Amino acid sequence: MRAPPLLLLLAACAPPSGAAVDPTPPGWEPAPDAPWCPYKVLSEGPETGGGRLCFRSPVRGFRCQTPGCETLASAGGSLRAHVLRNRSVLLQWRLAPAEARRVRVFALNCSWRGTYTRFPCDRVLLGASCRDYLLPDVHDSVRYRLCLQQLPLRAEVAVVPPELAECVEFTAEPAAMQEIVVAMTAVGGSICVMLVVICLLVAYITENLMHPTFRRPSLRRQP
């Protein structure tokens, strides 16, 4: 089993006061008795095989804090992507009860835009009980496109056509570059403070040691 510790940490941390938060709308929060989510990652390439079956727990109480998180929605509104500053993306989706009974599996297709064409990335198959998925380690400044499609039950394939995929596009911000800029700004400020202290110290030494003050001769007559 692989449980995402990052999401558990995000769910447990409350947002600070004064920070804008995108609340979880009704219908997006998983049920208290929601089962484990089975999923399988199908990597690209002929030697990757069919993937390994894994399980993850649903995310509860997630809040998208605007300084470090951005929420994007698909055209149909049933798929949401929360782009976090740590280069991970949390996907959430919801279905009507009638639609949920017809779903056999969800297919999550991923691609990213290159200079002249689009390149596919890992494909994920998720069980019918899944309502969220964490996509870790996305690349900075790359335009991603994620599409979630509902695959119906085998008995209803000929009766009910597959639903059109809900897609969302996003670009992860270069968080590492922002951290470097912040660090360089902090270091530059420290250097400026040190230079000011050194200048004051040199001025003090020059004034008091290089040019010592002489006492004036006393005007009192000696007996």
UniProtKB/Swiss-Prot annotation:
Q: What is its main location?
A: membrane
Specify the signal sequence span.
Answer: 1-19
Q: Does the keyword Transmembrane apply?
A: yes
Query: An example Gene Ontology cellular component term from the record?
Result: membrane
- Membrane topology classification: Single-pass type I membrane protein
As for subcellular location, the record says: Membrane
* Classification via InterPro entries: Fndc10
Transmembrane portions of the chain? 180-200
**Which residue range or ranges hold the Fibronectin type-III domain?**
72-168
Output this protein's name.
Fibronectin type III domain-containing protein 10
